[in-house]
């Protein structure tokens, strides 16, 4: 069977008239409130009847007639007597009453026996024990749906602790779904029942002492309003309390007496204000109210009047659809007979299929006769009255408009002065240098002060900074109370706690936190002994003195071996005149003692040498030395940068395990801080051992403030356990402090608020906005960077100063001085052994210096100062070997004419190395020094003459 659907605006015409009365459709309404000014139920029924009868589409002459009966009291006897008066009139349905649960039960039972439809408009009572008749339909939303809606709101606000105030014992049954939700989630829900005095003051005081911020009130509208007024007298109507009223008419109450409009008051409503007739309906009730009840202002239509209006339309719509399929007739019934209405069951089936939009929203019933597929509007109290911020639908659940809810809170924050509790702690909050000359918030500066300014600019609120009385962050006492800033928030003495307040699970149970504005962890701060700073000769540090000594010995050993090997191998001896092979008996060896010492130096300095080894043995020595120098130079270069730039630190511990495994270094944390709580509650074995040590150590290793802990670190063998942000701050300002290891945990700093504060979401959004704009990072850099110590994580190349590499300049200067001194000695030595002249040594020195200063040509005559040595006695010719010449060093040199060669060599005294085996032979071979006599074959006169000419061709 298709569902019956009809618009409420234009009701279709009747197709068939009822048999017993072709001109009327009779409905009975029972009202239990005879005062018209109280609810307007009589007027609403009249408005519905007249609107239906005036419908232009109505066909025929049938009209709707509503007979109204009044109950003076909630009496079963009076109710039964009234029903016996209604049944003989031949009604198609009975409406009401709007209250009186006992009367409603009697009416439902009688209608069920006679199979006459009954519409209930009152809240259901005794859900567990009341039997719902098939003929009974309830237009009022069920308490089960309301309890589910309340649970959804609590879940939306993340509420884990609440209190339920019941006006009657039946509320525990009516709100069973809500209680079951708390049982499943294991959250805390305390239930308090009003006593017979109906005075809610004692209950409210208990709730205030328990610090419960969310209060659910299940009572009628008048009692709910009374409870709210009493709460205002006790100071419980503020921004830290949330009230949820289950009564659907609470939004009609006047809130003029509320002083603090920041309180979060939520209620429900099912009025469909978008209905075309709603405004006319409300105006009609208002006009009637003004005529009959001018002593009380009109606040809005009562829910029962709107439900009765919709009930009339639902009955007419169902009768219309039933007449489409069959002709129905209504006959009088009697309480004294067992006769029933034969069309009652059919009409009930059509009533259960009705779907229409009424003054109370969508009207539809389920198989149990309860209203379904409708929505409860969620209202929030504002400065301008109640405003819808969401809805709860039977099928779709809760849907909240967070934007509207947040805007209401923003309006509440606008121009509101919040009390901020805080604590003096660098760099979060500090007194200015001239704070005595200032007052109010201007006395303070720091990270938290700047952050408060940013938040106040975004949320448009005012604030007053106040230092916490006991100077601590907050720890629980043995009696359950809290100290410090946490205690002030619990006592509602402050609105915000802005400081380095750590978010912990224990604190989260008693106060609310915003999202963290800074992430950190526990770290270890310790004093270090700085090693020796890089000095002038720090370029020698990459190698130890022993290595330098062994390198010197290796150099001398290689030089000696090279000199020995070069002398032994015949391949290092060669003719200085390769173009005159066979005609010159001179052999030259380039590895003199000086060259043997110079060649390793060139290889070690990676500059090379003009001396190249010829023999395989000398090349082997050279290759081994080069490989040795390659490794040495590479190792030196790799370590040089570190030794020139890094100032090594002497730290006896490197991790938290090292700290826990020793007893020489004391360690502790701030007493009453979150770090102390962390070690106290930790289950990690290492941290448990550390807590046992700190707890039992005497004298105490706990400190009262961060400054005291820093002073103890600097003045004694003490390691301080504190947050990493404070660690970084003090390390930036004292280079003797360092962090040991990494973080022991991860946590955050948040803004503390009293439980239930409606401002938390607003501050969360503001903090996220500051983080996205990088404002918090900018503020941290402003207050953390001290500039005294470089960042440890900065690995960029840094310029070296004279204190790092000054020693190499000293070596260079000393080398230059030694070279100048040696040049002077060589100059004097040459003058002493030159041919004698009349010029003195000093004059020669002055002349040479003048030519150096004037940059004259590098050509001057040979110096002669020393007396000419007497000629050597001629060697007897019979003692001279034929075809050889004797040099001054005793070596023999072959020549064509011995006398001429000897005379030539005597004249070229500068070319003869006295006491040595070397001599320069020709211009092309000036580098060849070693001369060695070898057997000379018989030569012709032409060969000897050519050699003579060749050896005598060297210029002066």
From Swiss-Prot:
SUPFAM superfamilies: Periplasmic binding protein-like I, Periplasmic binding protein-like II. It is a multi-pass membrane protein. Residues 567-623, 826-956 are cytoplasmic. Glycans are attached at residues 158, 220, 272, 286, 323, 408, 415, 479, 736. L-glutamate binds at residues 500, 502, 507, 674-675, 723. One of its GO terms (cellular component) is plasma membrane. GO terms for molecular function: kainate selective glutamate receptor activity; transmitter-gated monoatomic ion channel activity involved in regulation of postsynaptic membrane potential. Residues 939-948 have a biased composition (Basic and acidic residues). InterPro entries: ANF_lig-bd_rcpt, Glu/Gly-bd, Iono_Glu_rcpt_met, Ionotropic_Glu_rcpt, Iontro_rcpt_C, Peripla_BP_I. GO terms for biological process: modulation of chemical synaptic transmission; synaptic transmission, glutamatergic. The chain crosses the membrane at residues 546-566, 624-644, 805-825. Belongs to the glutamate-gated ion channel (TC 1.A.10.1) family. GRIK4 subfamily. Ionotropic glutamate receptor that functions as a cation-permeable ligand-gated ion channel, gated by L-glutamate and the glutamatergic agonist kainic acid. Cannot form functional channels on its own and produces channel activity only in heteromeric assembly with GRIK1, GRIK2 and GRIK3 subunits. This is Glutamate receptor ionotropic, kainate 4. The gene is GRIK4.
């Amino acid at each position: 069977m298709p569902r019956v659907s009809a618009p409420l605006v234009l009701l279709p015409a009747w197709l068939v008239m009822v048999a017993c009365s072709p001109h009327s459709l009779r409905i009975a309404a029972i009202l239990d409130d005879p005062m018209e000014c109280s609810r307007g139920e009589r007027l609403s029924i009249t408005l519905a009847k007249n609107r239906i009868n005036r419908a232009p589409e109505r066909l025929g002459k049938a009209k709707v007639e509503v007979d109204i009966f009044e109950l003076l009291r909630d009496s079963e006897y009076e109710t039964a007597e009234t029903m016996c008066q209604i049944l003989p009139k031949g009604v198609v349905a009975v409406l009401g009453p709007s209250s009186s649960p006992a009367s409603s039960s009697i009416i439902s039972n009688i209608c069920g026996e006679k199979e006459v439809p009954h519409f209930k408009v009152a809240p259901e009572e005794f859900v567990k024990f009341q039997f719902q008749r098939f003929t009974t339909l309830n237009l009022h939303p069920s308490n089960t749906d309301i309890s589910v809606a309340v649970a959804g709101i609590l879940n939306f606000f993340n509420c884990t602790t609440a209190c339920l105030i019941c006006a009657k014992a039946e509320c525990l049954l009516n709100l069973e779904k809500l209680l079951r939700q708390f049982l499943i989630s294991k959250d805390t829900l305390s239930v308090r029942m009003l006593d017979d005095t109906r005075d809610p003051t004692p209950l409210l005081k208990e709730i205030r002492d328990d610090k419960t911020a969310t209060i659910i009130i299940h009572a009628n509208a008048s009692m709910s309003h009374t409870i709210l007024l009493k709460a205002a007298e006790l100071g419980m109507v503020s921004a830290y309390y949330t009230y949820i009223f289950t009564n659907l008419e609470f939004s009609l109450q006047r809130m003029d007496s509320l002083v603090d409009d920041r309180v979060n008051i939520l209620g429900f409503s099912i009025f469909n204000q978008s209905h075309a007739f709603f405004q006319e309906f409300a105006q009609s009730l208002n006009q009637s109210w003004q005529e009959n009840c001018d002593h009380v202002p009109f606040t809005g239509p009562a829910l029962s009047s709107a439900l009765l209006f919709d009930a009339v339309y639902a009955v007419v719509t169902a009768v219309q659809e039933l007449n489409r399929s069959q002709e129905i007739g209504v006959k009088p019934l009697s309480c004294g007979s067992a006769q029933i209405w034969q069309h009652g069951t059919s009409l009930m089936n059509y009533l259960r299929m009705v779907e229409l939009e009424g003054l109370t929203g969508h009207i539809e019933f389920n198989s149990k006769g309860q209203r379904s597929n409708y929505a409860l509007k969620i209202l929030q109290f504002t400065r301008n009255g109640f405003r819808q911020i969401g809805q709860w639908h039977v099928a779709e659940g809760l849907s909240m408009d967070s934007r509207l809810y947040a805007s209401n809170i923003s309006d509440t924050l606008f121009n509101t002065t919040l009390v901020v509790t805080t604590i003096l702690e660098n760099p979060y909050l500090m007194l200015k240098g001239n704070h005595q000359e200032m007052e109010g918030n201007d006395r303070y500066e720091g990270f938290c002060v700047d952050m408060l300014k940013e938040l106040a600019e975004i949320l448009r609120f005012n604030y007053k900074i106040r230092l916490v009385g006991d100077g601590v962050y907050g720890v629980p006492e043995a009696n359950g109370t809290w100290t410090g800033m946490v205690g002030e928030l619990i006592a509602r003495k402050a609105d915000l706690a802005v400081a380095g307040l750590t978010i912990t699970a224990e604190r989260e149970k008693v106060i609310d936190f915003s999202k963290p504005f800074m992430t950190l962890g526990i770290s270890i701060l310790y004093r270090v002994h700085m090693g020796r700073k890089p000095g002038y000769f720090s370029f020698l540090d990459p190698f130890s003195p022993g290595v330098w000594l062994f390198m010197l010995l290796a150099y001398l050993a290689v030089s000696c071996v090279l000199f020995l090997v070069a002398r032994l191998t015949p391949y290092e001896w060669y003719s200085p005149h390769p173009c005159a092979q066979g005609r010159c008996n001179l052999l030259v060896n380039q590895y003199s003692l000086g060259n043997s010492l110079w060649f390793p130096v060139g290889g070690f300095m990676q500059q090379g040498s003009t001396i190249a080894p010829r023999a395989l043995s000398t090349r082997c020595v050279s290759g081994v030395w080069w490989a040795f120098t390659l490794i040495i130079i590479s190792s030196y270069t790799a370590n040089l940068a570190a030794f020139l730039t890094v100032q090594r630190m002497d730290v006896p511990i490197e991790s938290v395990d090292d700290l826990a495994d020793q007893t020489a270094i004391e360690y502790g944390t701030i007493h009453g801080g979150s770090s102390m709580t962390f070690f106290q509650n930790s289950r990690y074995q290492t941290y448990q051992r550390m807590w046992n040590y700190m707890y039992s150590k005497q004298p105490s290793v706990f400190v009262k403030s961060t400054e005291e802990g820093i002073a103890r670190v600097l003045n004694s063998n003490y390691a301080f356990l504190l947050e990493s942000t404070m660690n970084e701050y003090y390390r930036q300002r004292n280079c003797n402090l360092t962090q040991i290891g990494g973080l022991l945990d991860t946590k955050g700093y948040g803004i503390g608020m009293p439980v239930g504060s409606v401002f938390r979401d607003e501050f969360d959004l503001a903090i996220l906005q500051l983080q996205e704009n990088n404002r918090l990072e900018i503020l941290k850099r402003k207050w953390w960077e001290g500039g005294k110590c470089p960042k440890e994580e900065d690995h960029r190349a840094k310029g070296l100063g004279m204190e790092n590499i000054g020693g190499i300049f000293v070596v260079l200067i000393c080398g230059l001085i030694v070279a100048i001194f040696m040049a002077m000695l060589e100059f004097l030595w040459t003058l002493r052994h030159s041919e004698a002249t009349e010029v003195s040594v000093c004059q020669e020195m002055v002349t040479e210096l003048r030519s150096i200063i004037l940059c004259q040509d590098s050509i001057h005559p040979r110096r002669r100062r020393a007396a000419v040595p007497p000629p050597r006695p001629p060697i007897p010719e019979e003692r001279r070997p034929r075809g050889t010449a004797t040099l001054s060093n005793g070596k023999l040199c072959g020549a064509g004419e011995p006398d001429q060669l000897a005379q030539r060599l005597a004249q070229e005294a500068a070319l003869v190395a006295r006491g040595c085996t070397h001599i320069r032979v020709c211009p092309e071979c000036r580098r060849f020094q070693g001369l060695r006599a070898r057997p000379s074959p018989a030569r012709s006169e032409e060969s000897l003459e050519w050699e003579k000419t060749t050896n005598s061709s060297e210029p002066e």
